[in-house]
């Protein structure tokens, strides 16, 4: 399904010295090289540059921006490519696709999936991407059994600038992005910022999406060293569209029918829906990137990161057994009620942090990387029932029917090298050791 979009933008740049900026540009170019494939790596891959991304960046999620790369399939719950979208490569789902940003793992530590809805308009802050198809090179985070998507954020701008981009299209789909940057200050400092809003009514009925995000970056550069602090966040509110209509429902109610949130049908045959059948989530990401060039042959990358996620989704459920939610049956007019309609909330409060590194060597016929990382995830997931239809008795709005806490520590180290045997023949080796310790403790009502 195609979504028609119209875009417009305004950009203002100031001038700066080419000599001042050359050193900073060179430093930024050597970042995040250890997890990338090259022409001599025995891996199928596609590089997507900034210019290519800009041509298709009208607000849709990153899976849709990658939809024209080989062996890629994308889906969208709302039908507009915004909100809950998925990416498959060579038939492999998102749980087997490794995603990194600046070499830092982005996959959810428990499900191994990546929820792109929590990274709205992130492509506006991406310099380039590499998609590796099949089992890719050693990387950080979830195993890359099906594919890898390696993203590198924009480098610091050497010139002051201000930029606005907007687009509008089908189903009231819109995107507004504001970007500003200071350019190079005192030959050492740079600061950049982005604010974005994206929304759509969705192709599917009531599949509305409201997304807000920001991206902040500050950098300090010397002759051979760079330090960058990056903070980005996404806040989303999406109406559920993941229930999916059956063939029979679409034949009766139309292709855009959305069964999510349906409560009842009145005497006139009109269906009524629950207004708060929404997913609400805020995810904040922080990255501290350090790069040092020792010589033309040696460079070191070290990164620390922290991600905080907090949110919930709420839904109307009809005819549910009360005992499943830790509630006792109640009596109305002498009849015991064991099943009733209710509203439930599933909440989460998750934290993920750690560090990654890579030491890279390139000279003559040999290129090699020694890298790895150590990360820890702590999850706190729980469910509540704030309302039960016709409930008799006391019901706390904070009534909890399950809670589970998890802790996952993941460490890995890898060594890979490429050696040119002759002009047209090279040898490649890639070794990795990974250790995971995962514990979970839960209880049901």
Set out the residue ranges of the language-model regions.
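Short acidic/polar hinge/loop motifs at secondary-structure boundaries
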Residues: 88, 105-133, 152
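Short, acidic, small-residue-rich periplasmic hinge/interaction motif at the N-terminus
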Residues: 15-55, 94
């Amino acid at each position: 399904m195609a979504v028609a979009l119209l875009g417009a933008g305004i950009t203002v740049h100031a001038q700066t010295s080419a000599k001042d900026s050359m050193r900073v540009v060179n430093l930024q170019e050597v970042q995040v090289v250890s997890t990338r494939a090259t022409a001599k790596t025995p891996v199928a891959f596609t590089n997507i540059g900034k210019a290519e991304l800009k041509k298709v960046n009208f607000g849709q999620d990153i899976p849709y921006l990658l939809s024209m790369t080989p062996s890629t399939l994308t889906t969208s719950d709302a039908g507009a490519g915004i909100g809950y979208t998925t990416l498959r490569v060579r038939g492999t789902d998102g749980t087997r696709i490794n995603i990194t940003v600046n070499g830092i793992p982005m996959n959810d530590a428990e499900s191994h999936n990546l929820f792109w809805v929590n990274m709205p308009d992130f492509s506006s802050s991406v310099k380039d991407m590499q998609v590796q198809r099949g089992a890719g090179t050693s990387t950080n985070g979830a195993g890359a059994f099906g594919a890898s998507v390696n993203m590198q954020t924009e480098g610091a701008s050497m010139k002051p600038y201000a930029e606005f981009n907007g687009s509008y299209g089908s189903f009231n789909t819109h995107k507004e992005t504001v970007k500003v940057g200071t350019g190079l200050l005192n030959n050492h400092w740079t600061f950049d910022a982005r604010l974005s809003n994206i929304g759509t009514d969705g192709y599917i009925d009531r599949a509305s999406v409201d997304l807000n995000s920001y991206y902040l970056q500050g950098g300090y550069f010397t002759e051979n060293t760079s330090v960058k602090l990056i903070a980005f966040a996404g806040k989303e509110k999406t109406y559920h569209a993941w229930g999916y209509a059956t063939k029979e429902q679409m034949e009766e109610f139309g292709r855009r029918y959305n069964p999510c949130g349906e409560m009842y049908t009145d005497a006139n045959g009109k269906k009524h829906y629950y207004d708060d059948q929404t997913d609400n989530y805020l995810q904040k990401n922080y990255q501290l990137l350090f790069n040092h060039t020792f010589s033309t042959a040696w460079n070191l990358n070290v990164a620390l990161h922290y991600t905080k996620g907090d949110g919930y989704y709420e839904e109307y459920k009809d005819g549910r057994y009360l005992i499943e939610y830790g509630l006792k049956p109640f009596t109305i007019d002498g009849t015991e009620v064991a099943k009733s309609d209710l509203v439930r909330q599933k909440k989460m409060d998750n934290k993920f942090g750690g560090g990654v590194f890579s030491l890279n060597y390139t000279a003559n016929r040999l290129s090699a990387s020694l890298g790895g990382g150590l990360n820890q995830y702590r999850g706190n997931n729980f469910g509540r029932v704030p309302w039960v239809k016709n409930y008799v008795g006391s019901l706390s709005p904070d009534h909890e029917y399950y809670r589970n806490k998890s802790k996952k520590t993941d460490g890995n180290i890898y060594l890979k090298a490429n050696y040119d045997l002759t002009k047209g023949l090279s040898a490649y080796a890639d070794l990795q050791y990974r250790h995971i310790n995962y514990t979970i403790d839960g209880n049901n009502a």
